[in-house]
Amino acid sequence: MKRIGNLYEKVCSIENLQLADEKARKGKLRTYGVIEHDKKREVNLLKLRETLLNGTFHTSKYDVFTIYEPKEREIYRLPYFPDRILHHAIMNVLEPIWVSTFTADTYSCIKNRGIHAAAKKVKQALREDPEGTTFCLKLDIRKFYPSINHDVLKSILRRKLKDKRLLCLLDEIIDSADGVPIGNYLSQYFANLYLTYFDHWIKEQKRVKHYFRYADDIVILASDKSYLHSLMGEIRAYLGDLKLEVKGNWQVFPVAARGIDFVGYVFFHTHTRMRKGIKKTFCRRLAKLNKRKRRSEEHTSE
């Protein structure tokens, strides 16, 4: 595989930092970080460029908080300036390079893919190959983001990149928190990269026809239940080499009996339905919106 260099200057260019600033602020124009940054925007970008060029950039302190929907998770948030701008600047340059390494079977946080593309592909497989999709192997990884090993991730980055200064910067960002922190813009790409060679192994060496991955949520379809059980043993070993552990609730089951619970839907050969939890969340949010609307109307009529 050809390794790519001469990227650091592209990341550090003032034009790229300005573009990153424009991207990072989308949907956040009224937030404190953007408002403060805009008071001295040009000076800040020049300062960021200087710290990158002289090698003195260090990741800022994280603001860590917990969310409870759809499940309890710790979220790590960095300041808008300089960190979020820098992460976008890095991805302006690296996104096409990294995405080129992904197989067509992974869907999380990739432009023109996502949940709907994953759902479409699962439906297509079930419709076009009912015999070859009789059984499903469903698995996910225990505490995937916190379990990502820094040394393994760094070695994966070096399979595609050879720019020493850029790799040094990426190493600093990686080492700024345990695992890969949920909430960082770069984290979703690091997570996809961490499993991209596993994807290639599944498709190119194991010759799995029906394989779908969304983050660490994995679905494999086949006609033979015993084959899927055997493959699961190999998957567990491969992921173990990546310092990852499969959750104990993995299952092999007939699709006709219970459907495939994946990306918010439950898929059968003949139909698809929305997951119950998604329906409940939607109904709760709709009820809140209707309640606000009624209050607003009552206030207006007074």
Feature annotation, model-predicted:
Residues 2, 79, 88, 226-230, ...:
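Right-hand nucleic-acid polymerase module
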Residues 34, 181, 185, 266:
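Gly/Ser/Thr-rich beta-alpha loop segments that engage phosphate groups in nucleotides
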Residues 51-52, 105, 120-215, 219-234, ...:
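Conserved polymerase palm-domain catalytic core
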Residues 60-62, 212-216, 249:
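Short Gly/Ser/Thr- and Asp/Glu-enriched loop/turn motifs at secondary-structure junctions
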Residues 93-97, 197, 201, 238:
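Active-site catalytic microenvironments for nucleophilic, acid-base chemistry
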Residues 100, 204-210, 243-246:
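Surface-exposed helix-capping loop/turn segments at secondary-structure junctions
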Residues 236-244:
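A common structural junction motif
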